[in-house]
Amino acid sequence: EALQSIAGYTCYNDVSIRDYQRHTSQFVPGKNFSKTGGCGPFLKLASSINNYQSLTIKTILNGEVMQEAKLDQLIFTIPEIISYISSFTPLVAGDIIVTGTPGGVGDRRDPPLYMKTGDIVEVEISEVGKLVNPVLDENIIL
């Protein structure tokens, strides 16, 4: 039933503001800054995807693949995520659910790898598309 409620799939650049993310044990403070979550470039209709679990998601930093995994490797399936979220908040048409990121996060690398002004970040999902975002200095963000 949960899969029938999905209009489509898109890319989302799940940016983290690490210093705020460390204020608590939860990720929320570091995930909800204005103008930090790029989405798009378009919505691929769910009806045009035969098996979402076969899709591959990649994060590419300056041309180098940093993260890559198939959606069947998610800790929780998309129906499980929808079911869980709908257990504590109503979901309505237009809501976006972001599933998270594959292994390979820069903060967990040895040594850690942090994005800097001028970097180019790409989030690509096979059969869905590619979102390309530049990393800008926070003082010049419009």
Question: What are the residue ranges of the model-derived segments?
Answer:
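N-terminal accessory regions of nucleic-acid-interacting proteins
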Residues: 1-9
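Catalytic-pocket segment enriched in acidic/His residues
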Residues: 18-142
